Amino acid sequence: MSNSTQHWIAQRGTALQGSLTIPGDKSVSHRAVMFAALADGISKIDGFLEGEDTRSTAAIFAQLGVRIETPSASQRIVHGVGVDGLQPPQGPLDCGNAGTGMRLLAGVLAAQRFDSVLVGDASLSKRPMRRVTGPLAQMGARIETESDGTPPLRVHGGQALQGITFASPVASAQVKSAVLLAGLYATGETSVSEPHPTRDYTERMLSAFGVEIAFSPGQARLRGGQRLRATDIAVPADFSSAAFFIVAASIIPGSGVTLRAVGLNPRRTGLLAALRLMGADIVEDNHAEHGGEPVADLRVRYAPLRGAQIPEALVPDMIDEFPALFVAAAAARGDTVVSGAAELRVKESDRLAAMATGLRALGIVVDETPDGATIHGGTLGSGVIESHGDHRIAMAFAIAGQLSTGTVQVNDVANVATSFPGFDSLAQGAGFGLSARP
């Protein structure tokens, strides 16, 4: 079965059991291929996510003159060209659906000697980019967007960048990363502060590639003119992908699964804290470190969940996991309240609206607010769900179908391949009732 099918039929399967290996982390895979391309020397990447988004980023660096070998689906050998070795592309650089790729590349390309154009698919072409182009312009970059601040990004090369002290108005790891990457090329020091701490993948991996960077929660600082040294990276399993199985095992009676070597970046694991507030049974084991990132096995067993007020401080640390959390909330006893999550309205879809509408279609009462929702736990029924081409919405409702009193049809699931190729096959093997329709 392939994620490229048009829709899924999800219905009750069996309790989830066994040990599952989740594909590599998308955020780490993007950065690994990007930083390896900018490094001096040859880097080997193991556990690379073979998804559409990460393939787009790798293909862009190939267009920029970087040789990338693919010994296997989950490996890349990158022949770095150094920070000053990228070559002018012959045409537009297509980021596909990858907001991470586009925003981080904007920081890198802003400092090159050549012009470039970053484009994306229909979904990415609706996403806000001024949050990135604004601070880059403060550094001296020249980047044009559409009149509403959306892609394509037309990057004018040959600009001399200056380091800045930037207080980001949004808690966004992508904005922070774009500014820091431009800062590598800038004169002087570049520092970024955030209203709330965000994921520090960029900081950890730049350090792994030999860059001197000072960082702590909500703060990062580096000086320009540094070079990256090639290194080998082992990409951990993607926490956001694991999240769907964490939630599924928590709400499907009789379940007990182990998820191997999952990345547990402290700015990524808000979902674990939220689920534990709701009574989930999640145990961490075999802690280690892969490529500067903390990892552990997660043992998850079914537990009756109860509604909870989700602390706003957790929101930036679980921004991609809210679709899965909403399904957990629907299955819980009582009400779950989410606030401070307006960022969900400008993801691959308006995730607050999409999840609220979808859960209502299955009989769950949801009170939507501008920055969140109250989900009243109940019984999930049958219905037809529009995923709006959003991979995380699609996977969330595949879980919902496992508790449905009937069947859940999830439309437009092709984009699941952007982050989790093979999700449906892995889910079936674990016990999901899930089938594909053309």
Swiss-Prot record:
Q: Which residues bind 3-phosphoshikimate?
A: K26, S27, R31, S172, Q174, D320, K347
The record's listing under SUPFAM superfamilies reads: EPT/RTPC-like
- What EC numbers are recorded for this enzyme? 2.5.1.19
Catalytic activity annotation:
3-phosphoshikimate + phosphoenolpyruvate = 5-O-(1-carboxyvinyl)-3-phosphoshikimate + phosphate
Active site (catalytic residues): D320 (proton acceptor)
Protein origin, superkingdom = Bacteria
Alphabetized InterPro entries for the sequence: Enolpyruvate_Tfrase_dom (IPR001986), Enolpyruvate_Tfrase_sf (IPR036968), EPSP_synthase (IPR006264), EPSP_synthase_CS (IPR023193), RNA3'P_cycl/enolpyr_Trfase_a/b (IPR013792)
Identify the enzyme class.
transferase
> One GO biological process from the UniProt record?
chorismate biosynthetic process
Sorted alphabetically, the keyword list is: Amino-acid biosynthesis, Aromatic amino acid biosynthesis, Cytoplasm, Transferase
Annotated binding of phosphoenolpyruvate, by residue: K26, G99, R127, Q174, R351, R392
Q: An example Gene Ontology cellular component term from the record?
A: cytoplasm
Tell me the route in metabolism or biology where this protein functions: Metabolic intermediate biosynthesis; chorismate biosynthesis; chorismate from D-erythrose 4-phosphate and phosphoenolpyruvate: step 6/7
Q: Where in the cell is it found?
A: Cytoplasm
A GO molecular function held by the record: 3-phosphoshikimate 1-carboxyvinyltransferase activity
Q: Which PANTHER family match?
A: AROM/DEHYDROQUINATE SYNTHASE, PENTAFUNCTIONAL AROM POLYPEPTIDE
Report the sequence similarity comment from the record. Belongs to the EPSP synthase family.
* Complexes and interactors: Monomer.
NCBIfam families, per the entry: aroA (TIGR01356)
Please give the function described in this protein's UniProt entry: Catalyzes the transfer of the enolpyruvyl moiety of phosphoenolpyruvate (PEP) to the 5-hydroxyl of shikimate-3-phosphate (S3P) to produce enolpyruvyl shikimate-3-phosphate and inorganic phosphate.
State what protein this is by name.
3-phosphoshikimate 1-carboxyvinyltransferase
Q: Which organism is it from?
A: Xanthomonas campestris pv. campestris (strain ATCC 33913 / DSM 3586 / NCPPB 528 / LMG 568 / P 25)
Lineage at the top is: Bacteria, Pseudomonadati, Pseudomonadota, Gammaproteobacteria, Lysobacterales
Q: Which gene encodes it?
A: aroA
